[in-house]
Amino acid sequence: ICACLVGSEMCIRDRYQLTETQAMVAKLPVLTGDCDTVTMMSYGFDPYLSTWSPYHGAIYAVTESVAKIVAAGGDYSKIRFTFQEYFRRMTEDPHRWSQPFAALLGAYNAQLGFGLPSIGGKDSMSGTFEDIDVPPTLVSFAVDVAVEKDIITPELKAAGNKLVWLRIPTDEYDVPKYDQVMELYGKFREDVQAGRIVSTYALDRHGIAAAVSKMAFGNRMGVKIEHDVDARDLFAPAFGDIVAEVPADKVSELAITYTVIGEVTEDAAFTYRDMEITEADAEAAWKAPLEKVFPTNSGAEG
C-alpha cells in the first residue's frame, strides 16, 4: 500500500525513498480553509500462515491490519474493516468447504475480540485452474480516520535513539488475548500523541530483522541489536507486534510494556553480537529477487 500524506510535504519522507510504508494516509480535500483530518487504510494477510491454518490466517490478517494502523498513529477503536476472500472451487467434496468456513470463523473471532465490524467485502470461490488451487485467502483491509499531526512514518530518524519491541500476548492456541492487545494499542497511541515515538513498523512473518532493516534503508542509518536478544526472535513471525524508535531520554516515560532490542547508529551497518552486515550488502540482497522483474536501474546515462 502506498503510504504518504497526500497533499502534504510528507510524501517525501525518507531521503532515499527505500523504507516500505505500511499504511495509506490521505488528507481530505477542501475548497477553502485547512483540514487536518486524514483517512487511513492498511491491509493484513499471510498466505503461508493461511495455508497452515485458514482460521489463524484470518485472525492475524485482521490483527496485522489493525497493527499497521496503530503503528502509523491511528486509533484502533475507530477502525472498520472490509474483507477480500479467495478460495479454491467448491465441489461436492465436503472437505473443500472447510477452508472458507474456518477462515470466516477466524475473522469473526477477531471482530468479536476487537469489538470492530467489517462493513463489506468481496469473495471468490472459483480459485481453481485444472489441478491448481489458490491458497485459502482472507485479506483484511482496515480503514480509519485520524489527525495529521499524529501520523508516524516508518523510517529511522536519528542515531542514538533506542528501538523497542511491543509484543502482543496470545493464549495457548496462539490466538491474541484481545483485551490485553487493545490495552497495549491504546497505550501505544498515548505514547505517539505525547511525542515519545518517532518511527514505527508493524511486524509480519519475517520478524524483527526484516522490519528494522526496512526502517534503516530509507535514511541509510545503522542498527545495533542488543546482545541479549534471542537470535530466534529476529526472524520469527510476530503478527500484531510493533517495533518503535524512541529517543533515549523518552524510553523511561513510555506507557507501553516494551523490550529494548537495539539502538540506531550512524554507521550504515547492521550489528548483532560478533556479526556485521553492511547496509549496501543488505540492500542489494533485498532488491535482488525482483530486480529482473522490476529493474531499479534503467542503465541509461545522465
Model-derived segments and spans:
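Single conserved hydrophobic/aromatic residue that forms the stacking wall/gate
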Residues: 1-7, 12
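Hydrophobic alpha-helical scaffolding
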Residues: 14-15, 43-59, 72, 90-101, ...
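Conserved phosphate/anionic-ligand binding catalytic regions in large, soluble enzymes, centered on
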Residues: 15-17, 66-75, 155, 199-215
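N-terminal small/glycine-rich loop or linker at the start of catalytic domains
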Residues: 28-29, 33-49
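Glycine-rich anion-binding loops of enzyme active sites
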Residues: 45-48, 78-171, 242, 246, ...
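Short, well-ordered amphipathic alpha-helical segments that serve as non-catalytic structural scaffolds
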Residues: 58-72, 103-106, 184-185
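Glycine-/charge-enriched secondary-structure boundary and capping motifs
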Residues: 100-110, 114, 119, 123-136, ...
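A glycine- and small/hydrophobic-rich beta-loop-beta segment
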Residues: 157, 162-168, 173-200
